[in-house]
Amino acid sequence: MKNNKISGFQWAMTIFVFFVITMALSIMLRDFQSIIGVKHFIFEVTDLAPLIAAIICILVFKYKKVQLAGLKFSISLKVIERLLLALILPLIILIIGMYSFNTFADSFILLQSTGLSVPITHILIGHILMAFVVEFGFRSYLQNIVETKMNTFFASIVVGLMYSVFSANTTYGTEFAAYNFLYTFSFSMILGELIRATKGRTIYIATTFHASMTFGLIFLFSEEIGDLFSIKVIAISTAIVAVGYIGLSLIIRGIAYLTTRRNLEELEPNNYLDHVNDDEETNHTEAEKSSSNIKDAEKTGVATASTVGVAKNDTENTVADEPSIHEGTEKTEPQHHIGNQTESNHDEDHDITSESVESAESVKQAPQSDDLTNDSNEDEIEQSLKEPATYKEDRRSSVVIDAEKHIEKTEEQSSDKNK
């Protein structure tokens, strides 16, 4: 992400603080389950812990935009595609589980399908709310933070381990806890792949998958009452689907790479085979910008110096030409014959005209030097040329006026002598 990037220290502290607050709140909120009077299979109060932890971290730590980058609520075609997968994958897991029950246990349990103490709609709404608050914290917030320094695959592993610890169930023994850990970790890995490359639009996908899984398991299996075979079937089924889905995704992207000869980063941002090195990329980009700015400044300085040099030379040439004009006029002293005076006057006019032409040519030469500079510096060069050109024009006009006065004076003197 291009942004005010989270430093490595803040990144680690954010993950640590989130996990500590989540675990502490999950312990403290257990006592409130009986107080609010809601059954745990409808809504688990401890599931509020990730949501509260995410809100606290957003308020405490800086770079709010980076922290909220995974909390977008817009819809895209990719989101719709992943939403369909979020409904299909739980169905595949449940089908594998039911087939396993029919094969190895002769039947599967349709738990509490009759004689429920609450309507099914209440259970559905409760599971959607539970899925939203949990995934808001773990997927939309925590996984987004972890992915700022890791790619999706390793970020999913980190978040999966934390989620498995949060969801650990040691009530029914070590073996049950081990299969429950496998189930929740595989569950989290599937979710990490589902929300990959969705550009922060994660909450719909994660909530849909989570609610579909928990709602189906409530009715079809009895793992929540400690049945070891049920949790074993669910864990293995979920792990098989996780390996198959992630492996198939990698194969498809690998085929796309072989056919297009483009790397996976071009096909999908934040891929498994490319580690995110935001700090190094930022430093490299800043170094390139600074070097280009230095080169532009050097070019501008050279162009300005050359322009000033041309203007200065033109001014010196104009000043140096003035004495020659005066000397030429002084040589036109009255002669013994009017014809000689007229010829000298014509010579002076010719000299003045030739000097004007040369000066004009020198003025034309100055803009030619502008072609050597960049287009962005043309205004500065024209501004620097404006004052020397005006000065030269004033000097030439004064020289011409002096010459005309001198000619008139010599003509008057010659006419007086003739009289």
Swiss-Prot record:
What happens in the null mutant? Abolishes normal short glycan strand length. Reduces biofilm formation. Cells show an increase in lysostaphin resistance, without a concomitant decrease in beta-lactam resistance. However, mutants are also reported to show an increase in lysostaphin resistance and a decrease in resistance to the beta lactam oxacillin and to an antibiotic targeting biosynthesis of cell wall components, tunicamycin. Minor defects in peptidoglycan and pentaglycine cross bridge structure.
Q: Which lineage? A: Bacteria, Bacillati, Bacillota, Bacilli, Bacillales
Q: Could you tell me what induces this protein?
A: Up-regulated by the two-component regulatory system WalK-WalR.
Q: What is this protein called?
A: Lysostaphin resistance protein A
Q: Which family does it belong to?
A: Belongs to the LyrA family.
The GO cellular component terms are: plasma membrane
| Positions of transmembrane segments | 9-29, 41-61, 84-104, 118-138, 153-173, 175-195, 202-222, 231-251
Q: What is known of its domains?
A: C-terminal region not involved in glucosaminidase activity of the SagB-SpdC/LyrA complex.
**Which ranges are annotated Acidic residues under compositional bias?**
372-382
Region Disordered: start and end of each range? Answer: 273-419
Classification via InterPro entries? Rce1/LyrA-like_dom (IPR003675)
User: What's a Gene Ontology MF term here?
Assistant: endopeptidase activity
Origin organism is Staphylococcus aureus (strain NCTC 8325 / PS 47)
